[in-house]
Amino acid sequence: MPRRRRIEPRKILPDPKFGSELLAKFINVLMVDGKKSIAESIVYNALETLAQRTGKDALESFEIALENVRPTVEVKSRRVGGSTYQVPVEVRPTRRNALGMRWIVEAARKRGDKSMALRLANELSDAVDNKGAAVKKREDVHRMAEANKAFAHFRW
Protein backbone atom coordinates (compact mmCIF):
# COMPACT_ATOMS: atom_id res chain seq x y z
CA MET A 1 0.00 0.00 0.00
CA PRO A 2 1.46 3.36 -0.98
CA ARG A 3 1.97 5.91 1.78
CA ARG A 4 1.95 9.09 -0.27
CA ARG A 5 -0.71 8.98 -2.95
CA ARG A 6 -3.28 6.70 -4.51
CA ILE A 7 -1.93 4.80 -7.51
CA GLU A 8 -4.01 5.12 -10.66
CA PRO A 9 -5.02 1.77 -12.16
CA ARG A 10 -3.46 1.01 -15.54
CA LYS A 11 -5.58 1.77 -18.57
CA ILE A 12 -6.38 -1.33 -20.57
CA LEU A 13 -6.68 -1.07 -24.35
CA PRO A 14 -10.07 -2.15 -25.75
CA ASP A 15 -10.12 -5.39 -27.74
CA PRO A 16 -9.63 -5.04 -31.53
CA LYS A 17 -12.86 -6.70 -32.71
CA PHE A 18 -15.59 -5.29 -30.43
CA GLY A 19 -13.81 -2.28 -28.91
CA SER A 20 -14.75 -3.33 -25.37
CA GLU A 21 -12.43 -2.87 -22.39
CA LEU A 22 -14.40 -5.49 -20.46
CA LEU A 23 -13.82 -8.08 -23.19
CA ALA A 24 -10.12 -7.14 -23.37
CA LYS A 25 -9.85 -7.79 -19.63
CA PHE A 26 -11.63 -11.13 -20.08
CA ILE A 27 -9.17 -12.13 -22.82
CA ASN A 28 -6.31 -11.30 -20.43
CA VAL A 29 -7.89 -13.46 -17.70
CA LEU A 30 -8.20 -16.39 -20.14
CA MET A 31 -4.65 -15.96 -21.50
CA VAL A 32 -2.07 -18.59 -20.50
CA ASP A 33 1.72 -18.09 -20.74
CA GLY A 34 1.35 -14.72 -22.51
CA LYS A 35 -0.27 -16.26 -25.61
CA LYS A 36 -2.76 -13.50 -26.26
CA SER A 37 -3.55 -14.31 -29.90
CA ILE A 38 -4.67 -17.82 -28.89
CA ALA A 39 -6.81 -16.40 -26.06
CA GLU A 40 -8.36 -13.88 -28.48
CA SER A 41 -9.24 -16.57 -31.02
CA ILE A 42 -10.81 -18.74 -28.28
CA VAL A 43 -12.94 -15.84 -26.99
CA TYR A 44 -14.01 -14.66 -30.45
CA ASN A 45 -14.95 -18.21 -31.55
CA ALA A 46 -16.90 -18.70 -28.32
CA LEU A 47 -18.75 -15.39 -28.78
CA GLU A 48 -19.53 -16.27 -32.41
CA THR A 49 -21.01 -19.61 -31.28
CA LEU A 50 -22.93 -17.84 -28.52
CA ALA A 51 -24.35 -15.26 -30.96
CA GLN A 52 -25.52 -18.01 -33.33
CA ARG A 53 -27.11 -19.91 -30.44
CA THR A 54 -28.94 -16.97 -28.83
CA GLY A 55 -29.61 -14.87 -31.91
CA LYS A 56 -28.55 -11.77 -29.96
CA ASP A 57 -25.47 -9.55 -30.21
CA ALA A 58 -22.39 -11.43 -28.95
CA LEU A 59 -21.08 -8.59 -26.76
CA GLU A 60 -24.54 -8.02 -25.25
CA SER A 61 -24.84 -11.73 -24.40
CA PHE A 62 -21.36 -11.69 -22.85
CA GLU A 63 -22.28 -8.71 -20.65
CA ILE A 64 -25.54 -10.40 -19.54
CA ALA A 65 -23.59 -13.58 -18.69
CA LEU A 66 -21.03 -11.60 -16.68
CA GLU A 67 -23.80 -9.69 -14.89
CA ASN A 68 -25.39 -12.99 -13.84
CA VAL A 69 -22.08 -14.28 -12.42
CA ARG A 70 -20.86 -11.13 -10.60
CA PRO A 71 -21.08 -11.40 -6.80
CA THR A 72 -22.46 -8.50 -4.76
CA VAL A 73 -21.32 -9.72 -1.31
CA GLU A 74 -18.57 -12.04 -0.14
CA VAL A 75 -17.11 -13.15 3.19
CA LYS A 76 -13.73 -12.14 4.58
CA SER A 77 -12.04 -13.76 7.57
CA ARG A 78 -11.71 -11.50 10.61
CA ARG A 79 -9.96 -12.59 13.77
CA VAL A 80 -11.59 -11.33 16.96
CA GLY A 81 -10.50 -12.49 20.39
CA GLY A 82 -8.95 -15.80 19.42
CA SER A 83 -11.70 -16.93 17.06
CA THR A 84 -12.07 -16.31 13.34
CA TYR A 85 -15.35 -15.01 11.94
CA GLN A 86 -16.47 -14.99 8.33
CA VAL A 87 -17.64 -11.38 7.97
CA PRO A 88 -19.87 -10.50 4.99
CA VAL A 89 -18.63 -7.47 3.05
CA GLU A 90 -19.78 -5.77 -0.13
CA VAL A 91 -17.60 -6.42 -3.19
CA ARG A 92 -15.98 -3.42 -4.92
CA PRO A 93 -17.02 -2.99 -8.60
CA THR A 94 -13.57 -3.79 -10.03
CA ARG A 95 -13.27 -6.92 -7.89
CA ARG A 96 -16.84 -7.86 -8.84
CA ASN A 97 -15.86 -7.95 -12.52
CA ALA A 98 -12.57 -9.74 -11.82
CA LEU A 99 -14.24 -12.47 -9.76
CA GLY A 100 -17.02 -12.95 -12.32
CA MET A 101 -14.51 -13.33 -15.16
CA ARG A 102 -12.29 -15.66 -13.15
CA TRP A 103 -15.24 -17.89 -12.20
CA ILE A 104 -16.46 -18.12 -15.81
CA VAL A 105 -12.97 -19.13 -17.03
CA GLU A 106 -12.52 -21.68 -14.19
CA ALA A 107 -15.94 -23.21 -14.86
CA ALA A 108 -15.23 -23.39 -18.61
CA ARG A 109 -11.88 -25.11 -18.00
CA LYS A 110 -13.57 -27.77 -15.85
CA ARG A 111 -16.17 -28.64 -18.49
CA GLY A 112 -15.72 -31.75 -20.61
CA ASP A 113 -16.36 -30.42 -24.12
CA LYS A 114 -13.97 -30.79 -27.07
CA SER A 115 -12.38 -27.35 -27.51
CA MET A 116 -11.91 -24.49 -25.08
CA ALA A 117 -13.94 -22.20 -27.36
CA LEU A 118 -16.88 -24.62 -27.16
CA ARG A 119 -16.51 -24.99 -23.38
CA LEU A 120 -16.46 -21.21 -22.97
CA ALA A 121 -19.45 -20.77 -25.29
CA ASN A 122 -21.42 -23.38 -23.30
CA GLU A 123 -20.50 -21.78 -19.96
CA LEU A 124 -21.45 -18.29 -21.21
CA SER A 125 -24.70 -19.70 -22.60
CA ASP A 126 -25.47 -21.28 -19.21
CA ALA A 127 -24.58 -18.03 -17.44
CA VAL A 128 -27.01 -16.10 -19.69
CA ASP A 129 -29.73 -18.58 -18.61
CA ASN A 130 -28.71 -18.23 -14.91
CA LYS A 131 -27.37 -21.77 -14.59
CA GLY A 132 -23.98 -23.45 -14.81
CA ALA A 133 -20.98 -23.79 -12.51
CA ALA A 134 -20.04 -20.08 -12.47
CA VAL A 135 -23.55 -19.02 -11.40
CA LYS A 136 -23.54 -21.80 -8.78
CA LYS A 137 -20.27 -20.40 -7.42
CA ARG A 138 -21.88 -16.96 -7.06
CA GLU A 139 -24.90 -18.50 -5.32
CA ASP A 140 -22.59 -20.34 -2.89
CA VAL A 141 -20.73 -17.11 -2.05
CA HIS A 142 -24.02 -15.26 -1.51
CA ARG A 143 -25.37 -18.12 0.65
CA MET A 144 -22.19 -18.03 2.76
CA ALA A 145 -22.57 -14.26 3.26
CA GLU A 146 -26.26 -14.68 4.15
CA ALA A 147 -25.45 -17.41 6.69
CA ASN A 148 -22.85 -15.16 8.38
CA LYS A 149 -24.98 -12.01 8.42
CA ALA A 150 -24.89 -12.11 12.24
CA PHE A 151 -21.20 -11.15 12.12
CA ALA A 152 -21.73 -8.10 9.89
CA HIS A 153 -21.04 -5.78 12.86
CA PHE A 154 -17.37 -6.93 12.81
CA ARG A 155 -16.92 -5.08 9.53
CA TRP A 156 -13.80 -2.88 9.37
Swiss-Prot record:
An annotated GO BP: translation
Instruction: Cite the GO molecular-function annotations of the record.
Output: rRNA binding; structural constituent of ribosome; tRNA binding
Q: Which UniProt keywords apply?
A: Ribonucleoprotein, Ribosomal protein, RNA-binding, rRNA-binding, tRNA-binding
The record's section on Pfam families has:
Ribosomal_S7
Recorded hits in PROSITE patterns, A to Z, give:
RIBOSOMAL_S7 (PS00052)
Mind telling me which InterPro entries this protein's record contains? Ribosomal_uS7 (IPR000235), Ribosomal_uS7_bac/org-type (IPR005717), Ribosomal_uS7_CS (IPR020606), Ribosomal_uS7_dom (IPR023798), Ribosomal_uS7_dom_sf (IPR036823)
Q: Which GO terms describe its cellular component?
A: small ribosomal subunit
UniProt family annotation = Belongs to the universal ribosomal protein uS7 family.
Q: How does it assemble?
A: Part of the 30S ribosomal subunit. Contacts proteins S9 and S11.
Query: What functional role does this protein have?
Result: One of the primary rRNA binding proteins, it binds directly to 16S rRNA where it nucleates assembly of the head domain of the 30S subunit. Is located at the subunit interface close to the decoding center, probably blocks exit of the E-site tRNA.
Q: What is this protein called?
A: Small ribosomal subunit protein uS7
Give the organism the record lists.
Actinobacillus succinogenes (strain ATCC 55618 / DSM 22257 / CCUG 43843 / 130Z)
State the taxonomy lineage.
Bacteria, Pseudomonadati, Pseudomonadota, Gammaproteobacteria, Pasteurellales
